[in-house]
A protein has these predicted regions:
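Generic non-transmembrane alpha-helical segments
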Residues: 104, 108-119, 206-214
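Acidic, Ser/Thr-rich low-complexity intrinsically disordered segments
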Residues: 229-258
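Zn-dependent metallopeptidase/amidohydrolase metal-coordination segment
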Residues: 153-190
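Metabolite-binding pocket within alpha/beta catalytic cores that recognizes anionic/polar moieties
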Residues: 1-98, 255-258
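Short acidic/polar active-site loop segments enriched in Thr and Asp
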Residues: 49-50, 149, 168
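Non-catalytic positions within long, well-ordered alpha-helices that form the structural scaffold/packing
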Residues: 44-47, 144, 163
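His/Asp/Glu-rich mid-to-C-terminal helical/loop segments that flank catalytic regions of hydrolases
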Residues: 180-227
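Active-site/ligand-binding-proximal alpha/beta "capping" segment
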Residues: 115-149
Length: 258
């Protein structure tokens, strides 16, 4: 399929950078309709080795007020109508998602955030809901009992697909609201989300600039993401059809062509 939009390719500080807007320019693709597989496949084709997701989220904790950034390290995937794997035909793979984000890339994000003096929290659990509707009060309260930190609609199956593509992944979430659980704050609406996003836009852009300058120094050369398919593909070689190997050439040629 086609990715969400044309990928912007540029160079900054002698590094090649790619940007893709998940929802398309002008925000016309619903979370459930984002072709995450096409997005990740396209980035892999371009030689992308690291992905940093920047997205808006609701807060599930009093301490995470609107405007605060969260460097997410865990996810609870509550989505149910999205294609979540590249390995769904003839070739089966089971990648580990115990630690879905790359620690070195998270360290780079933290340094970039600190340089901008942004209020942030290192580590947090992101509940990924299907959407596009916001939570009911009962759902919001349920997620709070799970000790989750934030809630949003976009990081899954994105993080899973990045892992299958052996691309390191990190998530920086910008808190825009208190979802609907907080008795002293209005229930979340689009106007509220956009207002906080606009306020944080400059901070987020500067954070990305800082990140691009220094992220390579934080990357762990032994990060297990980069060769996770070595121990993930379970299908016997003689059962791997050429049709499917061709389909997966961008994602898994490193292991399928051995």
């Amino acid at each position: 399929g086609k990715p969400s939009d044309d990928i912007l390719k540029t160079t900054f500080k002698d590094k090649e950078i790619c940007f893709i807007p998940r929802h398309g320019r002008g925000h016309f693709i619903s979370p459930s309709k984002i072709n995450f597989r096409a997005n990740i496949d396209a980035l892999k084709q371009l030689g992308v080795t690291d992905i940093v997701s920047v997205s808006a989220v609701g807060s599930l904790k009093e301490s995470l007020s609107p405007g605060k950034f969260v460097i997410v390290d865990q996810f609870i995937d509550r989505t149910f109508s999205r294609n979540k794997t590249f390995f769904d035909e003839d070739i089966v793979a089971h990648v580990s998602m115990a630690y879905p984000t790359s620690n070195g890339l998270m360290n780079a994000c933290e340094e970039a955030i600190k340089r901008e003096k942004i209020d942030y929290q290192r580590n947090g659990t992101y509940v990924v809901m299907e959407g596009p509707q916001f939570s009911t009060l009962a759902e919001s309260n349920l997620y709070r009992t799970w000790k989750a930190d934030v809630i949003g609609m976009t990081n899954m199956p994105e993080a899973k697909l990045a892992r299958e593509a052996e691309i390191r992944y990190a998530s920086v979430s910008m808190v825009t609201d208190y979802d609907c659980w907080h008795p002293d704050h209005e229930n979340v609406d689009v106007e509220q989300v956009i207002k906080v996003l606009l306020t944080n836009a400059v901070k987020a852009k500067n954070m990305i600039k800082n990140l691009i300058e220094n992220f390579e120094s934080h990357i762990d050369p032994k990060d297990p993401t980069t060769n996770c398919l070595d121990v993930a593909i379970i299908t016997a070689p003689e059962k791997r059809t050429q049709k499917t190997k061709d389909k997966l050439k961008n994602i898994a040629s490193r292991v399928l062509n051995k």
